[in-house]
Amino acid sequence: MVGSGIPALGLLLLMQGSADGNGIQGFFYPWSCEGDVWDRESCGGQAAIENPNLCLRLRCCYRDGVCYHQRPDENMRRKHMWALGWTCGGLLFLITSICLFWWARRHDMLRLPWFLKGKCDLSRTVSLLSKDRTPSEKKTPSVGSIPPAAPTEGALDVSGGTEGEGTEGGEETEGGDEDD
């Protein structure tokens, strides 16, 4: 795992370094043309001022007819260090998690504790959305529409629902008073 993380990070740094021509040093100490206008050092002399291409070939900055040296960019450096820190931290966390999982599996510690066994058994639960219910369970008629009869075992609702799936005793459901 470490063997693949380090080359990947090296490749990232190499690709970033080759983009600006400064190599890996450009990642840790980036340069930019941003900054205070009055705090510029001239670069390339009069020839670079007259020829912007010469100024850029010297890796200097050209703006407003002035050729000047790049300066270290602290904001970009901070961003690079932040990204590098999070990348290394993430790789370290991933490697540690994999090693810990592997160690626990080798020591046969990946079983549920005794107090959780049986609590997650979903085979005993009754779903209200189950398609296996009989037609008499799907819709409970109101008390006024049919005469009261002795309930059968299959007709009792034991799901523990709260929205009128079953009635208790002499309660009425949705129908209201229909014995006028």
UniProtKB/Swiss-Prot annotation:
Q: Name one GO cellular component term.
A: inner acrosomal membrane
Q: Known Pfam families for this protein?
A: TMEM190 (PF15431)
The chain's Extracellular topological domains, given as residue ranges, are 22-81
Provide Cytoplasmic-side residue ranges. 103-180
Q: Which GO terms describe its biological process?
A: hematopoietic progenitor cell differentiation
What S-S linkages are listed for this chain? C33-C61, C43-C60, C55-C67
Q: Where is the signal peptide?
A: 1-21
| Highest taxon above the source species | Eukaryota
Start and end residues of each stretch annotated as Disordered: 131-180
Q: What is this protein called?
A: Transmembrane protein 190
Q: Which organism is it from?
A: Bos taurus
Q: Its encoding gene is what?
A: TMEM190
